[in-house]
Structure formats: C-alpha cells, structure tokens
C-alpha cells in the first residue's frame, strides 16, 4: 500500500488532495511544514510527496530541494515530488527544484489523479493546462 505525504499549511488544500488522491490502496499522511515533511520522509519513506509551493517558512521549492539534496548524499532514499503551484510563473521554480511533477492551482481532481498515478508509476507529470503567453499572444498579433 503506497503512502502519499500531503504537505500544506492550508487545511483545505490538504483535505482536497487527500479526498482526491486517497483510495483504499493508498495511505495518506499529512504535514503542515517543510521541516515536518523532512521528518516524516526520514521516518516512513512515502511513495510520493505532494507539496504546496506556498507553505510557511520552508515552502515547496525549499522542501523539494532539501529532499533531493538528502537523496544525493544517500541520507534519504529518492522520493518523487508533486508540487502545487499558485501561478503559472512558478513553473520555472518547480523545474529548477527538480520536482517530478507539478500542477497549477486551482486544482482539478482529474488532473490531480492523473499526476498522482503518473508519479506513483515512476513517471512525471507537468501541468499543460495553461497556455504559455507566446501561444496566447500569437493569434492576437496575427489578427486571428
């Protein structure tokens, strides 16, 4: 039974993820901060960490970087990270952090389920639900 660690300082975000990602085949564990994520990963080594970008004094990017750093020194095993982003420009930060996947809020249950399934299966998931500005601007510039 895979364990999914859900990290956010917002109870509503944790509840939404748990309701969507949880099922009889998974165990959901919740964290409210980056340091709590680090402790729980060291104790239980979840199959996936879902982390909110905006979270207390150690947000999603810092937490993801720390998880990857610890894994690179063999202090922790590698655990995939799905990062929840507040805005489209945060994709740059998610890429830089090495997150294996990300979703831009507001969360869509179907995309969240797809992302969790992909990462639990050893894959990646990059939210393509938003259109880059160059794609949006091109039809406007051509008069279309």
Description of each model-found segment:
Residues 45-47, 72-80:
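His-Asp phosphorelay/catalytic-motif detector in bacterial-type signaling
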Residues 1-21, 49:
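Conserved acidic segment of CheY-like receiver
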Residues 19-21, 40, 93:
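Alpha-helical interaction/dimerization surfaces of two-component signaling modules
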Residues 123-144:
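CheY-like receiver
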Residues 107-117:
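C-terminal output helix
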Residues 62, 83-103:
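Alpha4 helix (beta4-alpha4-beta5 surface) of REC/receiver domains from two-component response regulators
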Residues 32-48:
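Acidic, metal-coordinating helix/loop segments flanking the phosphotransfer/catalytic sites
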Residues 47, 51-69:
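Conserved phosphotransfer microenvironments
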């Amino acid at each position: 039974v895979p364990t999914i660690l859900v990290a956010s300082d917002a109870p509503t975000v944790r509840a939404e993820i748990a309701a969507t990602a949880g099922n009889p085949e998974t165990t959901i564990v919740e964290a409210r901060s980056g340091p709590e994520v680090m402790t729980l990963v060291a104790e239980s080594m979840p199959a996936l960490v879902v982390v909110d970008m905006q979270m207390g004094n150690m947000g999603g990017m810092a937490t993801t970087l720390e998880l990857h750093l610890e894994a690179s020194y063999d202090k922790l095993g590698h655990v995939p990270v799905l990062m929840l982003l507040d805005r489209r420009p945060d994709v740059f930060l998610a890429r830089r952090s090495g997150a294996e996947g990300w979703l831009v809020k507001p969360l869509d249950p179907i995309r969240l389920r797809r992302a969790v399934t992909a990462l639990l299966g050893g894959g990646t998931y990059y939210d393509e639900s938003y259109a880059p500005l160059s794609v949006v601007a091109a039809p406007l510039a051509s008069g279309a």
